[in-house]
């Protein structure tokens, strides 16, 4: 008798194990707290790229606190908008809103409260530009991505990724009162990083998206085209990330050297996926590494502004300026 095997696609809980281990209270679950640390990391990256780094402790706390509150508000509003959609999928039907563990009214009040608190904290403790950019990020996530693009186009995350790319601008604005070249560079980097990151997850969950009619790229074009697109954006990410050497006010050489293994690993994983687009193992590995990659880039930006990194850069410049003896 022929043995029949079926491909069992992982759930989101299997892709991100922490979701399975920790059961959050309903009011906290809808705020999507697991997304906040990476957004705050890119906010810190935007600060580190500015001449105003390091910030005073009160300004730093207000910036990160306001950003966390704005992100929480965006998460709640996203859950409110998609509660009917979540209720139609087995994977998400147990979430707080579709399961009835939290009422829509309570969630909406919480979202408004977080939005107002974020605005007040950023205006009073940072500046109006940082507050305005933070609210722009909230609105772009809920209105541009969730409501307009996600249900209509397979390029939803390419355009809608602007929402996740705004925190570096908030960080830069908090540090100097304006958005300089470094802030815009990190904004662009997050924009081009987002498609490869999200499409890797969408490859794992494409049957869920297909079942409810969400036109994610793996659903519309299939894994081969998606893997090819991921490889393209992966290379763009690597090339653009290398320009951070010039975006940093100091410590660029340190950043450039330490970035090499991060980029090498990213290229290795996108290449593996392009060779075997149907591999769930490869898609999962890329998704997980992409998160660590962006955390790593932001950490390198911060470390590059230390005295140790500046000394390293100075030594590199001295070595490059030594006479070669060739005339």
From Swiss-Prot:
Subcellular location: Cell inner membrane
Stated role: Converts heme B (protoheme IX) to heme O by substitution of the vinyl group on carbon 2 of heme B porphyrin ring with a hydroxyethyl farnesyl side group.
Top enzyme category: transferase
GO CC list: plasma membrane
Organism: Synechococcus sp. (strain CC9605)
HAMAP family per record: CyoE_CtaB
Membrane topology, from the record: Multi-pass membrane protein
UniProt keyword Cell membrane, yes or no: yes
Domain of life (superkingdom): Bacteria
GO molecular function, one term: protoheme IX farnesyltransferase activity
Residue ranges crossing the lipid bilayer per the database entry: 35-55, 60-80, 106-126, 129-149, 157-177, 185-205, 234-254, 283-303
Catalysed reactions, semicolon-separated: heme b + (2E,6E)-farnesyl diphosphate + H2O = Fe(II)-heme o + diphosphate
Sorted UniProt keywords: Cell inner membrane, Cell membrane, Heme biosynthesis, Membrane, Transferase, Transmembrane, Transmembrane helix
Miscellaneous section: Carbon 2 of the heme B porphyrin ring is defined according to the Fischer nomenclature.
Designated name of the protein: Protoheme IX farnesyltransferase
Family, per entry: Belongs to the UbiA prenyltransferase family. Protoheme IX farnesyltransferase subfamily.
Gene3D superfamilies documented for this protein: UbiA prenyltransferase (1.10.357.140)
GO BP terms in the entry: heme O biosynthetic process
EC annotation from Swiss-Prot or TrEMBL: 2.5.1.141
Cysteine pairings via disulfide bonds: none
């Amino acid at each position: 008798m022929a043995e029949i095997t079926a491909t069992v696609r992982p759930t989101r809980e299997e892709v991100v194990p922490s979701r399975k281990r920790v059961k959050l209270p309903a009011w906290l679950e809808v705020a999507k707290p697991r997304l906040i640390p990476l957004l705050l990391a890119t906010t810190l990256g935007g600060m580190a790229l500015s001449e105003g780094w390091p910030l005073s402790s009160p300004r730093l706390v207000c910036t990160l606190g306001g950003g966390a509150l704005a992100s929480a508000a965006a998460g709640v509003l996203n859950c409110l908008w998609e509660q009917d959609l979540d209720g139609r999928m087995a994977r998400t039907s147990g979430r707080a809103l579709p399961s009835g563990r939290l009422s829509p009214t309570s969630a909406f009040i919480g979202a408004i409260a977080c939005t107002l608190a974020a605005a007040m904290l950023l205006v009073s403790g940072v500046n109006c530009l940082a507050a305005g950019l933070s609210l722009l990020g909230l609105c772009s996530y809920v209105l541009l991505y969730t409501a307009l693009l996600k249900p209509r186009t397979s390029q939803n995350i390419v355009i809608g990724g602007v929402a996740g790319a705004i925190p570096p601008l908030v960080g830069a604005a908090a540090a100097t009162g304006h958005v300089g070249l470094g802030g815009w560079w990190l904004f662009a980097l997050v924009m081009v990083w987002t498609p490869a990151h999200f499409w890797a997850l969408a490859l794992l969950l494409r049957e869920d998206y297909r079942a409810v009619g969400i036109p994610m790229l793996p659903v519309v074009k299939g894994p081969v085209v998606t893997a090819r697109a991921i490889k393209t954006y992966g290379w763009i990410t690597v090339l653009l990330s290398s320009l951070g050497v010039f975006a940093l006010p100091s410590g660029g050489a340190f950043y450039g050297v330490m970035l090499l293994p991060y980029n090498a690993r990213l290229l290795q994983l996108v290449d593996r996926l392009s060779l075997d687009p149907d591999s769930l193992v490869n898609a999962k590995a890329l998704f997980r590494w992409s998160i660590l990659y962006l955390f790593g880039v932001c950490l390198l930006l911060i470390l590059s502004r230390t005295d140790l990194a500046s000394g390293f850069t100075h030594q590199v410049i001295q070595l490059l300026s030594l006479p070669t003896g060739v005339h």
